[in-house]
């Protein structure tokens, strides 16, 4: 970690950089380290600018044509922009659980997840219109389960006549890498297989555009922990969101960002308010649990709920 954090500039490529943010946040919280998480996140989202690195690799923050593509990961510069589905899925793996260890970034991660889940649909042949994809005549073989590998701002590589002036364009690298590779190799098994990351993390709520994000789902090496969910409200008004209790016993909802209980003794469903443009980071506790201070953290018994710095 010391060698990583002491780099002079971003070396981001593919998926490893955001995992550094998760590791740093956990080391800071559980072992008293002081790694600069903001630096790692800036390196990730603003991208690599090193002339001897993967220059331009980062997170896209634009509209392409009529479509919002904010949050997709890939090259910010290649042909005006080239996003990849695998990389966009994979960033959620470390960043969503990261907020369990440092809630200061809960709002930013919640907003990013709303953007990227919205934009990811554009890789799927039945979710983007035929005029904006490279191989619509073969899309039936995908059954809308296999997506295109990439999404370009324009068809910079193949320059297909029918796609001239179109933005964005769903396509893939397959045919250009190996001579004789079929056009259908634009549909990507390796990318689409990782949709399970979103599948494990993301759930709808009773309010459109407010997602329930499971912060435990991809925190594979965590210690004992309570269910933790991130919610982000993109609206300019307060919204009431409801939590459904799947446990057999009653639960309480504790927001680690505001350090308050939002609802208690929920047997079936409990609702809470999220201020405009804000996030809630909810820990689901057995009803009546006693929160105590332990080594700078909130804990129930020997199980840490959250760091006080949240």
Please describe what each predicted stretch is.
Residues 246-261:
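Solvent-exposed beta-hairpin/edge-strand motifs
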Residues 1-11, 35-72, 111-128:
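Long, well-ordered core segments of solenoidal/helical folds
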Residues 70, 74-134:
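Membrane-proximal bilayer-interacting regions
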Residues 166, 172-248:
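Carbohydrate-binding surface patches
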Residues 88-99, 135-203:
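C-terminal capping/lid segments that line or modulate ligand- or cofactor-binding pockets
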Residues 13-27, 79-98, 191-196, 225-231:
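Well-ordered alpha-helical segments within folded domains of soluble proteins
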């Amino acid at each position: 970690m010391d060698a990583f954090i002491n780099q002079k500039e971003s070396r981001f490529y593919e998926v490893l950089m955001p995992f550094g943010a998760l590791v740093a946040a956990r080391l800071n919280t559980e072992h008293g380290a002081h790694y600069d998480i903001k630096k790692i996140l800036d390196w990730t989202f603003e991208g690599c600018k090193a002339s001897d690195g993967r220059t331009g690799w980062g997170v896209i923050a634009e509209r392409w044509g009529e479509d919002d593509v904010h949050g997709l990961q890939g090259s910010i510069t290649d042909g005006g922009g080239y996003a990849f589905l695998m990389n966009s899925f994979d960033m959620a793996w470390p960043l969503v659980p990261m907020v369990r260890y440092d809630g200061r970034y809960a709002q930013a991660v919640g907003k990013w997840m709303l953007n990227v889940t919205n934009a990811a649909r554009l890789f799927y042949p039945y979710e983007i219109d035929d005029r904006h994809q490279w191989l619509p005549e073969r899309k039936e073989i995908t059954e809308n389960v296999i997506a295109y590998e990439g999404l370009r701002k324009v068809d910079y590589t193949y320059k297909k006549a029918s796609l001239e002036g179109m933005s964005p364009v769903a396509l893939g690298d397959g045919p250009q890498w190996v001579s004789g590779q079929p056009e259908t190799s634009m549909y990507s098994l390796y990318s689409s297989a990782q949709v399970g990351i979103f599948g494990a993390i993301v759930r709808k709520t009773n309010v459109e555009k407010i997602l329930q994000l499971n912060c435990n789902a991809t925190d594979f090496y965590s210690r004992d922990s309570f269910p933790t969910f991130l919610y982000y409200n993109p609206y300019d008004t307060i919204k009431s969101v409801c939590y459904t209790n799947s446990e057999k016993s009653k639960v309480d909802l504790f927001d680690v960002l505001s350090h308050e209980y939002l609802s208690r003794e929920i047997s079936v469903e409990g609702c809470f308010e999220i201020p405009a443009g804000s996030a809630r980071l909810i820990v689901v506790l057995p009803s009546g649990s006693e929160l105590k201070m332990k080594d700078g953290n909130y804990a129930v018994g020997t199980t840490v709920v959250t760091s006080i710095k949240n």
